[in-house]
Amino acid sequence: MGADMGKVTWGFTCSIDGFIAGPGHDMSWMSAAEPLADGAIERMAGEVAVIISGRDGYDAAQAQRGERDELTSEAYGGAWSGTEFVLTHRPEELADAPNVTAMNCDITEAIGRALDIAGERNVQIISADIARQALEHDLIDELQVFVAPVFLGDGVRLFDVPGGRRVDWELVDTCDDSPRSFGRIYRPKRTSTGA
């Protein structure tokens, strides 16, 4: 990755018990999250050029659009604008969807195309399944973690890979504008394979 290229990030808010969405991708629990400082959401949104989402989450967001509040109905509460890739095995079904590019490809191709578009800005993954696929190929450069003070008990797990490999992370920064949300930035500890 060149010095003038953006990063591939996986950013999320999760419940204390490790869910990033409730049953049926419900996001109403996000109201329990501590609000971030003024300008924090806009700052984070400005760093992102391309969002990569999965089909299940995209469909749920569309179906729940009238039920979701401003914060959860659009990426970054509506503060973000850019390109959204939706990875799906049925891209033709989203041919008329506004503001999205539906793609039927593997994660390496999707991230490569996203990085080309992003330039110096970041590519943000907002799907647990897509992030899992990216981690399998060591494609995530940064993990952005926020925690909401709520137990969900059920829903979409943050990371659920029975038999999967261990991935170690190192803390590289804290989000000073979100101390009550436990905002933390990590990068993967990658082992060198050279001699």
Go through each PLM region and give its residues.
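Enzymes that bind and transform nitrogen-containing heteroaromatic metabolites
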Residues: 1-195
